[in-house]
A protein has these predicted regions:
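Short amphipathic, positively biased membrane-proximal segments
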Residues: 1-120
């Protein structure tokens, strides 16, 4: 089933681009990243997460561009979106990260919902 004309390749490609951009951003310009998301104590950890998110994005992009989104790639996309959204909501609620992270949570939940509805 393709809700609203979406197919899994498009959804995964969108997620991959989002992950590449948001993952690389703190690596390229930490100052602007912190202006939007708030100051960070452990910049090395922000960069580590950025590298991992970008790596997931790159892997998903290869799958989407090759029109070969496997169940494994779909699971990686869904699990990543679920995990990141839970972290966002949990730590905003605890006051550890800025409320702007709820925008990321909304994006992640939308990606998760779209990915879960589509079949490879």
């Amino acid at each position: 089933m393709k809700p609203h004309g979406f197919d899994l390749n498009r959804v995964i490609f969108t997620q991959s681009a989002y992950y590449l951009i948001t993952g690389v951003w703190p690596l390229l310009h930490m100052d602007s990243f912190e202006r939007i998301t708030g100051p960070k104590t452990d910049k090395w950890l922000v960069k580590t997460v950025g590298v991992l998110v970008a790596a997931i994005g790159g892997s998903l992009m290869v799958a989407a561009r090759g029109h070969t989104v496997s169940r494994e790639a779909q699971l990686l996309a869904a699990a990543s979106a679920a995990g990141l959204s839970v972290i966002d909501v949990t730590y905003v609620a605890k006051g550890r990260i800025a409320p702007v992270y709820l925008l990321d949570a909304i994006s992640e939940i939308a990606l998760l919902a779209a990915t879960a509805k589509l079949k490879p």
